């Protein structure tokens, strides 16, 4: 049997997993704050998409820039949907993997820039301020997580270095460390 992952669990499960993917853009706290983190990032991303479509129609001279932002937002959205579809057959928290953080993070960067530049006047300072407050609040937990990940990587690298120095053959290195 060549199947690696479980079959998709359906549209609603795929959308849930896609929102989980987007929630990871907040780092590890996005996992802790699920499902609110997914709703937060999903709504902001949808709002940015709507603002971009409005800018496309109302600012023809800005269409190249708007198209670029739409491409980035669309790419992250496509990653979220593809991950949602591909992982929805796994457990209920399959989309909340830390490895998705760097793939999902550009969505919030685009949200920040798009709302600050093209958004309605009332939101131009409110949304960036809210995002600043959220990221300031999450900075320390994310920093602690990164420090711990660095320590773990250093320990694994030290074991690997000892095995190489001891003359362990490549096939055993692969079997032990991969």
Residue ranges of each PLM-predicted region?
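Hydrophobic alpha-helical transmembrane segments
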Residues: 1, 54-58, 113-117
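Hydrophobic/aromatic-rich transmembrane helices and adjacent perimembrane loops
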Residues: 22, 93-117
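Transmembrane alpha-helix segments characteristic
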Residues: 60-87
């Amino acid at each position: 049997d060549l199947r690696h992952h479980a079959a998709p669990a359906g549209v609603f499960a795929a959308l849930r997993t896609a929102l989980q993917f987007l929630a990871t853009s907040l780092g590890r706290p996005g996992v802790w704050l699920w499902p609110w983190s997914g709703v937060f990032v999903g709504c902001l991303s949808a709002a940015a998409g709507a603002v971009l479509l409005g800018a496309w129609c109302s600012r023809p001279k800005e269409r190249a820039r708007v198209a670029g932002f739409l491409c980035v937002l669309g790419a992250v959205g496509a990653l979220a949907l593809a991950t949602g579809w591909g992982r929805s057959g796994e457990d209920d928290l399959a989309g909340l993997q830390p490895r998705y953080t760097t793939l999902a993070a550009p969505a919030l960067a685009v949200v920040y820039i798009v709302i600050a530049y093209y958004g309605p006047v009332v939101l131009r300072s409110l949304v960036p301020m809210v995002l600043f407050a959220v990221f300031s609040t999450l900075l320390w937990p994310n920093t602690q997580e990164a420090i711990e990940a660095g320590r773990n990587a250093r320990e694994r690298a030290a074991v690997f270095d000892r095995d190489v120095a001891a003359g362990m053959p490549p096939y055993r290195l692969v079997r032990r460390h991969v």
